[in-house]
Amino acid sequence: MQPILHLSLPEQIAEQAEFVVNNLQETRYQHTEHIDVDLGVYDCDCNGLVAFILERAAPDHYAKIPKETDQPRPRAFKYYEFFSSLVPDATGGWHKIDLMQDVRRGDIIAWRFAEIEPGHDTGHVLFAAETPVTDDSGNFSVRVYDSAAQPHFDDTRGKGEGKFVSGVGSGFINFKVDELGRPTAFQFAPSEGFRPLPIAIGRVGPFSGIAQA
């Protein structure tokens, strides 16, 4: 997919992710990446999908994300650590989004687990597909693009003809926020409750100036 020049960079990222979701022919969640665009094959984990999209839509921004020396790409907790480290007047192309209500299409949301164990997920990283909405209890629901081991709410993944039980897809994740509106916990799937973990949000933008709205 070629860049759509009239769109902002976050919107271009989201368009790339949506293209993958809409055109995949095979997908499963796995740590060993196997992606073949021509065949529509996207077998990867969450950071594999994010890396694949960013390398194509925003390679200079992707290069800013730190990775471990023994890993081919940044894992989920590295996105969390990087976004958390950003200051309000950052001019390095990435901007931290503090409030859930300020999330926009193309933003990247990441969280990390307390313990980083060899051979296990370190957290999760995903693209926001659209602006969050709130429910009567004040929780936020965000449609996302990601690669996941199980479907989220109202998800393109699942059981049934033409669906895949894991891998790349789009669905809704719910978030709780604190009194200031910062995300504090997430509900990943209908079978799970809210899980409190450190959450951080990043947005690509110019390499100087402020974040794009």
Walk through the language-model features, giving the residues of each.
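Low-complexity, Gly/Ser/Thr/Pro-rich intrinsically disordered linker/tail segments
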Residues: 141, 147-213
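Low-complexity, polar-biased intrinsically disordered regions enriched in Pro/Ser/Thr/Gly
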Residues: 33-37, 118, 136, 186
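Alpha-helical structural elements
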Residues: 24, 72-78, 88-89, 106, ...
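N-terminal capping segments
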Residues: 1-74, 195-213
